[in-house]
Amino acid sequence: METFLFTSESVNEGHPDKLCDQISDAVLDACLAQDPESKVACETCSKTNMVMVFGEITTKADVDYEKIVRDTCRGIGFTSDDVGLDADNCKALVNIEQQSPDIAQGVHGHLSKRPEEIGAGDQGHMFGYATDETPELMPLTHVLATRLGARLTEVRKNGTCPWLRPDGKTQVTVEYYNDKGAMVPVRVHTVLISTQHDETVTNDEIAADLKEHVIKPVIPEKYLDEKTIFHLNPSGRFVIGGPHGDAGLTGRKIIIDTYGGWGAHGGGAFSGKDPTKVDRSGAYIVRQAAKSIVANGLARRCVVQVSYAIGVPEPLSVFVDTYGTGKIPDKEILKIVKETFDFRPGMIAINLDLKRGGNSRFLKTAAYGHFGRDDTDFTWEVVKPLKWDKVHA
């Protein structure tokens, strides 16, 4: 049996880039909670003792940006300089302007257009992916790397591993078998965890705790064997972390946010963007399409692409590739997809309820992945029934 290795990585909520994603989405939540028609393009950057929120926001909401910055940093665990940032004493800078009137008239006609008339907020192409290798219909490499990161945060916050600090990264390599285009995981080849820690803990203690409290609860035993390689804090020291260790910026972790390198990516980031930004809403609807194709038994694995022009409601193109795993020809699956899903941005926002903010709705997406999550707020994960002729397939 010929196999190959594939790797995906993830980062914790305390990684500086992810901190920025979460602040940008916390701002989006606050705007949409008060004004569902808010137009938000919110970027965040961070470095030692400083967080800056900047971008273009048109909203009727009364938003305290500085409070959002401090609350988000505090919630992650950045409560003192020695962990990488002090939420209550860092500099919080704000530079927000209104959305360009040129963009506003072309996209939503200064809020005068009906939902079906609303144009894409920009040009671009987005991809959705699904695979039958996990119950979530997501790649195993991505699922495991993401869960390891989430588990690191869990054992830090519940006190199981008190030496942990907020920043951290994970990476998982899986050995796969290609079954006529479908991906079949055979075993976990390598597990890599680099986590921020305090001064008190030894490298041996770090390795033992990570194996017992993080890896063991996350990675199914059937995938681990005596040949599995573990790199646990291989640099030997990771005390300085968060924005103190590295600068952070919104939109720097787009592969972690999606499919861990599987499928494809159009390059657009998600966080801090309202649903007229097709970087986000377009990617969400094609995930729903790809997931529905696999869940309905039309294929074992597939990628769906959609593309847009600024100001134009209808997509320029829709593409489906099932990697040879389709039960019927891809062109027939494409026809079903076009009949089932409405790719116009205004309709995506309605059908996926993307104008509803608050209650950390989008903040939740900004760490540990936008896809494959079991949460009713992740409306794009709902499988739609697809009508096709199984008898003659």
Curated annotation (Swiss-Prot):
Name the record gives this protein: S-adenosylmethionine synthase
- Which positions does UniProt annotate for ATP binding? 15, 167-169, 235-238, 246, 252-253, 269, 273, 277
* Keywords noted in UniProt: ATP-binding, Cobalt, Cytoplasm, Magnesium, Metal-binding, Nucleotide-binding, One-carbon metabolism, Potassium, Transferase
Q: Indicate the family of this protein.
A: Belongs to the AdoMet synthase family.
Q: Where, by residue number, does Mg(2+) bind?
A: 9
Enzyme class per UniProt:
transferase
Q: Which residues bind K(+)?
A: 43
Q: Name one GO molecular function term.
A: methionine adenosyltransferase activity
Can you supply a Gene Ontology BP term from the record?
Answer: S-adenosylmethionine biosynthetic process
This entry carries the following GO cellular component terms, namely: cytosol
Instruction: Summarize the subunit comment.
Output: Homotetramer.
Q: What is its EC number?
A: 2.5.1.6
